[in-house]
Amino acid sequence: MEVDEDGYEVPSSSSKGDKKRFEVKKWNAVALWAWDIVVDNCAICRNHIMDLCIECQANQASATSEECTVAWGVCNHAFHFHCISRWLKTRQVCPLDNREWDFQKYGH
């Protein structure tokens, strides 16, 4: 064993004159992501959460996916913003667990 500049022991095979064991010539990084929601359909209109809600589908000439956003409650349930807004006009609770509704976040 040899000792490096900081006083740590290093194997003698890793001394400066030895050839490298391998060299990284190319590295392809891959990243994955996922939503923090279990169900990917809006429980109010039953459309996929990333598709237009039924209100936006009815007005498809003027609606875009940027206008049809997703809203999460503090209970972590997600709905189309238009759907949950319409629901909250009559009841101030989550449609799935009946807890008082508070927005956690909304957007894409």
From Swiss-Prot:
It comes from the Eukaryota. InterPro entries: RING-box_E3_Ubiquitin_Ligase, Znf_RING, Znf_RING/FYVE/PHD, Znf_RING_H2. Pathway: Protein modification; protein ubiquitination. Keywords: Cytoplasm, Developmental protein, Metal-binding, Nucleus, Ubl conjugation pathway, Zinc, Zinc-finger. Zn(2+) 1 binds at C42, C45, H80. The keyword Glycosyltransferase does not apply. GO terms for molecular function: cullin family protein binding; NEDD8 ligase activity; ubiquitin protein ligase activity; ubiquitin-protein transferase activity; zinc ion binding. Widely expressed. Expressed in embryonic, larval and adult tissues. One of its GO terms (biological process) is proteolysis. GO terms for cellular component: Cul2-RING ubiquitin ligase complex; Cul3-RING ubiquitin ligase complex; Cul4-RING E3 ubiquitin ligase complex; cullin-RING ubiquitin ligase complex; cytosol; nucleus; SCF ubiquitin ligase complex. A zinc finger (RING-type) spans 53-98. PROSITE patterns: ZF_RING_2 (PS50089). The keyword Oxidoreductase does not apply. Disruption phenotype: Severe pruning defect in ddaC neurons. Also shows defects in ddaD and ddaE neuron pruning and in ddaF apoptosis. RNAi-mediated knockdown results in apical detachment of scolopidial cells in Johnston's organ. Disulfide bonds: none annotated. Zn(2+) 2 binds at C53, C56, C68, H82. It is found in: Cytoplasm; Nucleus. Zn(2+) 3 binds at C75, H77, C94, D97. Pfam families: zf-rbx1. The RING-type zinc finger domain is essential for ubiquitin ligase activity. It coordinates an additional third zinc ion. Belongs to the RING-box family. Core component of multiple SCF (SKP1-CUL1-F-box protein) E3 ubiquitin-protein ligase complexes which mediate the ubiquitination of proteins involved in cell cycle progression, signal transduction and transcription. Through the RING-type zinc finger, seems to recruit the E2 ubiquitination enzyme to the complex and brings it into close proximity to the substrate. Required for the specific SCF-dependent proteolysis of CI, but not that of ARM, suggesting that it also participates in the selection of substrates inside the SCF complex. Component of SCF E3 ubiquitin-protein ligase complexes consisting of Skpa, Cul1, Roc1a and an F-box protein. In larvae neuroblast self renewal and asymmetric division, as well as ddaC dendrite and mushroom body axon pruning, the complex contains the F-box protein slmb (SCF-slmb). Interacts directly with Cul1 and Slmb. In caspase activation during sperm differentiation, the complex contains the F-box protein ntc. This is RING-box protein 1A. The lineage of its organism: Eukaryota, Metazoa, Ecdysozoa, Arthropoda, Hexapoda.
